[in-house]
Amino acid sequence: MIQQESRLKVADNTGAKEILCIRVLGGSGRRYAGIGDVIVATVKDAIPGGNVKRGDVVKAVVVRTAKERRRPDGSYIRFDENAAVLLKSDGEPRGTRIFGPVGRELRDKKFMRIVSLAPEVI
């Protein structure tokens, strides 16, 4: 579960290393984001010469959460860290590579480009 002020690792090659969630999109009272949800975040740490720099406000989709999530078949999915992939305004990923596994929920939420770039879908 991601909420305001949560820090997430960036799982793509845009140059950002860490982001801080400033808003969960999807309704005025929405408090938490899970796998496949879009957030607004600010870049807290970035590598020099990357596509984004520290202080940039970006949209991102959550691809891994440390809090377990129950799936419709009764199984649970949990990761070691919270991670996100930065998005362009049209919903496509900004980077050309995705690092680490991503949740199957991204396929249900129509993030097919991220699913195809990911090395593993769990």
UniProtKB/Swiss-Prot annotation:
Q: What is the lineage of its organism?
A: Bacteria, Bacillati, Actinomycetota, Actinomycetes, Micrococcales
Q: Which family does it belong to?
A: Belongs to the universal ribosomal protein uL14 family.
Task: Kindly list the GO CC terms recorded for this protein.
Answer: cytosolic large ribosomal subunit
Q: Which organism is it from?
A: Beutenbergia cavernae (strain ATCC BAA-8 / DSM 12333 / CCUG 43141 / JCM 11478 / NBRC 16432 / NCIMB 13614 / HKI 0122)
Describe the subunit structure: Part of the 50S ribosomal subunit. Forms a cluster with proteins L3 and L19. In the 70S ribosome, L14 and L19 interact and together make contacts with the 16S rRNA in bridges B5 and B8.
Protein known as: Large ribosomal subunit protein uL14
Enumerate the UniProt keywords alphabetically.
Answer: Ribonucleoprotein, Ribosomal protein, RNA-binding, rRNA-binding
Q: Does the record carry Acyltransferase as a key word?
A: no
Q: Which Pfam families match?
A: Ribosomal_L14
Record-level Gene Ontology MF annotations: large ribosomal subunit rRNA binding; structural constituent of ribosome
Q: Can you tell which superkingdom this protein's organism belongs to?
A: Bacteria
Gene Ontology biological process terms in this record: translation
Gene3D superfamilies listed in its UniProt record: Ribosomal protein L14
The record's InterPro entries line, in alphabetical order, gives: Ribosomal_uL14, Ribosomal_uL14_bac-type, Ribosomal_uL14_CS, Ribosomal_uL14_sf
